[in-house]
Amino acid sequence: MSQLIEEISRRRTFAIISHPDAGKTTLTEKFLLYGGAIAQAGVVKGKKNSRAATSDWMEIEKQRGISVTSSVMQFQYNGFCINILDTPGHQDFSEDTYRTLMAADSAVMVIDGAKGVEPQTRKLFKVCAMRHIPIFTFVNKMDREAKDPFDLLDEVERELGIETYAMNWPIGSGKDFQGVYDREKAELLFFSGISGKKRADKLEIDLYDPQVAQLLDSEEKHRQLIDDVELLSAGREMDMQAVRDGQLSPVFFGSALTNFGIEPFLEAFLKLTPPPLARTADCGVIDPFSPDFSAFVFKIQANMNKAHRDRLAFMRICSGKFERDAEYFHVQGNKKMRLSQPQQLMAAEREIVDEAYAGDVIGVFDPGIFSIGDTITVPGKKFRYSGIPTFAPEHFCRVSAKDSMKRKQFVKGTEQIAQEGAIQIFKVPGSGFEEVIVGVVGTLQFDVFQYRMKNEYGVELRMEMLPYEEIRLIDEYPGDLTDLNLGSDAELLEDYRGRSLLVFSSFWAIDFTCRRNPGLKVSEIVVAEG
């Protein structure tokens, strides 16, 4: 039991979220670099002479230099076992991103120092805030011209509604960026070396040391730094309970590309962020330190290894210890099973694991029995973890196979990719699945879907973008749904569960359609438990 407590206590499982190009994937790579998981940090943008970033594993990601699927990476650092959930940073992300946040115990929010809080940051922050998990802020790209640090703190508080506490303070920005002041240790960290591919050296020196003015090449800069730090000291105090409740975000400044502030951030973050949190199930709260194993499926990914045509279900372990070949119980399937090939991943690279603990993420071979949100327990326990949210799609496309002889592959491909949660599939009532309406949260998923159907299933698609922006469930209608009076701004659809829905070209069209059809009642599907 003491080993179980020790192993779980050293786990840290967190997601990294950001707006596109804020430097999230670069920061992830530097964490892996410091943890010894990789010897050289990859450069994200596609350059022929520089390898692709470790977390960007799908072929389309390597070509575009963006992350479009959520990767899972584990490494060891200073006695901690770290599980990073790397979410897509592209503007058009998917439900996969939201679901990945359900598996995290905390989040690192990466903000571009020049741009501040951007639209996608707000979306992802909202999902984290919904779960009340601790959120840590890393203000990146301080080696470029950036906003005033005080303005950035104000912006985070104003835009996101969370209080902030600066853990360190930048020394200059842009060409003048020379390091950070660590408030907890009350010392300056000067960094030498600008190569993003090597670990940065650091020089520690007291803030009031006369040498600081010489190192900064200016007494004025030294005085400004002292004034800033003293002003911070007169402000809000650090409150760990507020951090744990997701009400206060510790803020760190640095530069992922040039390594400024990365290692101090990682060390402080690991001390502040919590070990695996308790999770809510239908029988109550499950303690992560319980000896009984339990987990839930938060992601399904097909064809991670094209040669094997495999499908992996990613499970977040919530309590106890997992042991390879032990007998477990699939609650939704109501049957016992052995998970004989459990794998831990570094993006697309995998290795078989014999044991894993609460906080860890493992991938298990899925012949098609798992669904997102499923619970796995030890035999004799039949509780279910709270469902994983599904989010209403915002973009729609009519899709069919160009070659009608590829019908079987088309149906299989669309169903498998939909089961992963990247797309949602609808059809016109009474029709088959030879032609479907695909709904997504972000339009990049259309490109990914088209690419994967061709690359993995050998099916070229005919795709017609539809003008719809809103979707509603039909709750009530006194007549036959096929007799609905619909104009060109609405269409009747059916989902895989057989539920009837309407899609609309605008928010205004919803009210107009309801008025044209007395007795019609519809409702939003903003967040539904999956």
Segment roles from a protein language model:
Residues M1-G530:
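Structural and coupling elements of P-loop NTPases
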